Design a protein with these regions (language model features):
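Alpha-helical linker/edge segments of TPR/alpha-solenoid repeat scaffolds
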Residues: 224, 292-306, 332-343, 370-380
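Small-residue-rich helix-interface/hinge motifs
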Residues: 58-122
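Polar-ligand-bearing catalytic/cofactor-coordination segments
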Residues: 80, 115-124, 183-264, 270-276, ...
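Membrane-embedded alpha-helical segments that form the functional core of polytopic membrane enzymes
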Residues: 48-68, 162-177
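Topogenic membrane-insertion module of multi-pass membrane proteins
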Residues: 2-59, 109
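Alpha-helical repeat scaffolds
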Residues: 226-237, 262-275, 300-316, 340-354, ...
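Hydrophobic transmembrane alpha-helical segments that form the core helix bundle
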Residues: 122-219
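Alpha-helical adaptor scaffolds
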Residues: 254, 258-260, 279-323, 327-328, ...
Length: 380
């Protein structure tokens, strides 16, 4: 089973690489065509380099615009089917509804270019609308392709606008494909994979609803330990093969951490990580961080830490180096394992800097309690 899932993940990642290569190649051909129209005796090499740089920036701008269009699609179709706005993120820039007000915050998640999270409508007989919300981004990307393709026809081939609109078509089509076709892409499942999981399981629909409700309550300042207990009941092993349902295990272990029930949390995380659960790579990496932290403030065994801190985990922690729980884990390692107070103090300052911009104050409050736990261990 593990090898089968790995093959699926590898195939999905290969497809994403191929799609991005095709987008890059097609954009490159458009760039060459555009530059050829400006070559001549009066154009210097410096001017050609400048034009090339501006065109490359235009490709990046097209990708950014299509991310906005994609997340906007989730927002529009979510609102149309009874969801309410919770947060809207592009790259690390994020708008979040906080106590009824819209706030600007920063959040960076490896493997994601953006994210639109919404508060779900109430469940009715265990059901809720989810297809349009999940596919809304890809639908909007495809609609934009039609719009930009039509606009490109209004300008001559040598025009910058013709170039830019055609790049928008290429990027939009690529995004629609990579998000609409069910794929397990490295750290997270894409929209199509989520929709397929929901179609296959009624239990997954409830799990999806719980995830959205947890996010809604977190944005209102509530901690996991304060939320209804029945939201965090661990699904049976069969249900853990569904990526959305398996995420309830992540929430359940995080709630145990928030309650200070560390031994139970560690035992649950060990079980989840060693089993056949379909927990996405992003959350697996964060869960290993939690186990590292508990080991450091507990027995602090070198052999146990070595087993956790694999090359893959170190790479993950580097990619997620601004995330609060990762910084907290790095702080504990510096303070208690490396015995390096200066390094720990530097990490703590980084934590404070990123915490000030973090969208969920209740999570930062929980993180600070765990930081104090590490400090207390250092004093003993």
């Amino acid at each position: 089973m593990g090898k089968k899932k790995k093959r699926k993940g590898t195939g999905a990642q290969l497809l994403s690489i191929v799609v991005y290569l095709l987008i890059g190649a097609a954009s490159g051909l458009l760039i060459v065509r555009f530059i050829d129209n400006f070559t001549g005796p009066d154009v210097t090499i410096g001017q050609e380099i400048l034009i090339f740089a501006l065109l490359m920036l235009s490709v990046y701008a097209a990708m950014l615009l299509q991310i906005i269009i994609h997340e906007g699609g989730h927002l529009v179709f979510g609102l149309a089917t009874g969801y309410k706005f919770s947060s809207f993120r592009i790259l690390s820039w994020m708008f979040v509804r906080e106590n009824g007000k819209l706030r600007f915050r920063h959040l960076s998640l490896a493997g994601t270019g953006g994210q639109c999270l919404m508060a779900p409508p109430d469940l009715k007989d265990g059901a809720m609308p989810f297809l349009l919300y999940n596919f809304g981004g890809s639908i909007m990307n495809l609609c934009s392709c039609l719009l930009f393709g039509g606009l490109s026809l209004l300008f001559p081939r040598e025009s910058f606008f013709n170039f830019f609109f055609l790049v928008l078509v290429l990027v939009g089509a690529g995004f629609a494909l990579l998000n609409g076709v069910p794929l397990h892409l490295g750290q997270v499942d894409n929209d199509g994979a989520n929709a397929l999981s929901l179609l296959r399981s009624r239990e997954a629909v409830r799990a999806f609803w719980i995830q959205m409700k947890v996010n809604e309550q977190t944005s209102r300042g509530m901690r996991l330990s304060e939320m209804p207990e029945d939201w965090f009941v661990l699904p049976d092993e069969g249900a853990m093969n569904n990526g959305i349902t398996a995420y309830i295990g992540v929430l359940a272990s995080s709630r145990l951490m928030d309650q200070g029930r560390f031994e139970e949390a560690d035992a649950m995380m060990e079980k989840l990580l060693s089993g056949e659960s379909r927990i996405p790579g992003l959350h697996r990496g964060l869960m290993i961080c939690e186990r590292i932290f508990l080991e450091v403030v507990g027995k602090n065994r070198p052999e146990a830490l070595e087993s956790f801190l694999t090359g893959e985990q170190k790479k993950f922690m580097k990619a997620m180096r601004t995330f609060p729980s990762v910084l907290r884990t790095e702080y504990a390692l510096a303070l208690l394992t490396d015995k390096d107070p200066a390094k720990a103090e530097k990490i703590l300052k980084e934590f404070d800097r990123y915490a000030a911009k973090y969208p969920y104050p209740s999570e930062i409050a929980a993180e600070r309690e765990l930081l104090k736990l590490a400090e207390k261990q250092a004093e003993e």
